[in-house]
Amino acid sequence: MAKIWDERNEWQTMLDVEIAACEANAELGRIPKEAVEVIKAKADFDVERIHEIDREINHDIIAFLSAVGEYVGDEAKYIHMGMTSTDVKDTALNVQIKQASDVLIAGLEKLAEVLKRRAVEFKYTPTIGRTHGVHAEPTTFGLKILLWYSETLRNIERMKRAASEMAVGKLSGAVGTYADIDPYVEEYVCKKMGLTPEIVATQVVQRDHHAVSYTHLRAHETG
């Protein structure tokens, strides 16, 4: 999980989006294929250099593109064609969220397996039940664990819905009208990054996706 949210991985994911967009534009004939090969071979960045440029110009994506351009050279002019900053940032963020969701889901599935096994193991182990915070009628420890198992299964499904809700990207330009970018670029990049294109967007992926996703995540805290 730490690797997913490491700052270098954040910028690398943005670079992956940019390179994929270059590949799509090359297929459309908007970028020389030779230039794309140069970009793929040379593209890199130094995180501290990004921060250094950002302090001067106060624009993180321009700082990022400038830092990458120092490695790529003349072919850097083909990077970010027709795109707006959030085409890169929102799409890359949602890739990271998808990756993090996969880690969480895998962890919950392992937890569910353990809880199921323990519920059977302690099926006949007596324990005291509680109501109103005090002792009530007897129950079994296995039944208590089975309750946690059932809740974990629901949380797995919630996490899957949350991940699906966030698995969208957009490369549709400054106001979502594809004024300077072909919709094929969005389709190509999203498919390559494991996302689906946002149906309608402005400059950003609409934040109702995030609201629904975070609501599902908060459900884990109620157990």
Give residue ranges: language-model regions:
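Acidic, proline/serine/threonine- and glycine-rich low-complexity intrinsically disordered segments
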Residues: A211-S213
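A helix-coil-helix interface module used to build multimeric assemblies
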Residues: M1-Y178, D182-K192, P197
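Single conserved hydrophobic/aromatic residue that forms the stacking wall/gate
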Residues: H216-G223
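A structural signal for small-residue-enriched, beta-sheet-centric alpha/beta enzyme cores
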Residues: P197-V204
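The DNA-recognition helices of helix-turn-helix-type DNA-binding domains
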Residues: R207
